[in-house]
Each structure stands twice: as structure tokens, then as C-alpha cells.
Regions:
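Conserved catalytic core of Hanks-type protein kinase domains
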Residues: 51
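Primarily recognizes Gram-negative and organellar outer-membrane beta-barrels
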Residues: 2-44, 54-232
């Protein structure tokens, strides 16, 4: 804000200003790393940068699978400056998958010299996907008038499932009770917000007039289904 109006608003920010020779502001650079292991487990990450005059483009991503969780992410940043217009933004897409299961066998010894056996199986899986983006635009209409617009967007959706089975047997392997339970859940959410500002310098002494507009929208849904049965 202080840069636009010329008036100190008290909100100081530490900025690291790196300047590169014009002859060096072009070309590509980047790196990539990857690894692969047993049971199709993997891990990879990479990035690439593009420079051309006053245009910057950066793309980066990661992916991994450790057997229980798998994650993928890719993002991009872009900026471009011209005499009248400065614009840019970033976007990121993410996905997470998880899958786990467990088995448990126990034996309990009772006071009447008998025992009980318990069997338990648990399984769960789920998936979450999300995308987020933010942009910035700055128009310099003339030497005194500037318009700035900064919107952001976020969207996510997911689902999860879980199941549980347990059974208790006596020492003669006769069932005493059995329990079964399942759960299913889905959700999605969308949100956006932004600001629009019009600034006009009145004179060279720091007097300005500004009009600011803000908006915010958030909407989401969630559904859950559960079923549990016990048998004796």
C-alpha cells in the first residue's frame, strides 16, 4: 500500500531484492530427483524455472508412496511486468491417498481355567484432492491512478471408508459374539475471496484517495453413513 500511495502506513515488510543482469534474465534451469524401492514404493521431486526479460515462470512438484500414504503435488508460479500492467499468480494441485489394515489375535485366560479368543480386523482407506490458486493484477492507468485486484480460490473434496470386524470364541471355538461396523464419509468445500482497490494520487505531497472493496465466499457439504451390527 505504501508503495502505491507514497505514504508510510506503518506496515513494514522485509524484502530481499536480488537483481540480475539483463543478459542473464533468460533461459531455463531446474533439477530432478527420484528414487524407487521394494513393493513399488517411490519418491520423486523436481522443479524448473524459466526467465525471459521481465517474465518469470516456475514449476515444481513432488510425488511419493510409502505403502500406506501416497501424495502427489504440482504447482506453478508466474509473473509478468510491463509498463502499464503487472500480473502474476500461483496454482497448486494436491492429492493424497491412504490405505491401511490391521489384524489382531488375542487370548484371554479366565478364572475357571478356560480361555477366550478374540479376532479383530480393521481396514480404512481414503482420498483427498485439492486445488488452490491466487492471482494479482496491478494496472497503472496513468501516473496518478492505479487499480489492484487480488483474488484467491480454493476447492477440495474427499472420501473415506473404514470397516471393523471382531469375533469372540470360547476355548471350544464356539462363537460368543460378533461385531461388524462400516463407515463412509464424503465432503467437498469451495471458498474464494479477494480485494479490489482503486487509488488516485491528488498531488505530490502524499495526498491520496482510495476505494477498497472486499468479498468472501465459503460453501461446503459433508455426508456420513455408519452401520454397526452385533450378533450373539
Amino acid at each position: 500500500m505504501a508503495r502505491i500511495t507514497g505514504v508510510d502506513d506503518g506496515k513494514e515488510e522485509m524484502v530481499l531484492d536480488l537483481r540480475v543482469k539483463p543478459s542473464m534474465r533468460k533461459g531455463w534451469n531446474g533439477n530432478f530427483e527420484a528414487g524407487y524401492g521394494n513393493d513399488d514404493h517411490y519418491r520423486a521431486k523436481g522443479m524448473a524455472n524459466r526467465f525471459k526479460n521481465k517474465m518469470n515462470l516456475s514449476i515444481n512438484g513432488t510425488a511419493n508412496d510409502n505403502g500406506i500414504n501416497s501424495n502427489q503435488r504440482i504447482g506453478a508460479n508466474y509473473s509478468q511486468n510491463t509498463q502499464k500492467l503487472k500480473y502474476g499468480g500461483s496454482i497448486e494441485v494436491r492429492e493424497n491417498k491412504r490405505d491401511s489394515w490391521s489384524k489382531r489375535h488375542t487370548e484371554s485366560f479366565l478364572s475357571d481355567n478356560t480361555s477366550q479368543f478374540s479376532l479383530q480386523n480393521n481396514q480404512s482407506d481414503g482420498k483427498t484432492s485439492a486445488i488452490s490458486a491466487n492471482f494479482r493484477f496491478e494496472w497503472k492507468l496513468d501516473s496518478l491512478t492505479t487499480i489492484m485486484y487480488r483474488p484467491t480460490f480454493n476447492f477440495s473434496k474427499g472420501n473415506s471408508n473404514s470397516g471393523n470386524f471382531s469375533e469372540t470364541l470360547n476355548n471350544e471355538s464356539t462363537p460368543i459374539n460378533r461385531k461388524e461396523a462400516t463407515n463412509h464419509q464424503t465432503n467437498d468445500r469451495f471458498s474464494t475471496n479477494g480485494s479490489l482497490q482503486l487509488n488516485r494520487k491528488l498531488n505530490s505531497k502524499g495526498r491520496n484517495i482510495a476505494l477498497r472493496l472486499y468479498y468472501d465466499l465459503d460453501d461446503g457439504n459433508s455426508d456420513r453413513y455408519s452401520l454397526s451390527n452385533t450378533y450373539y
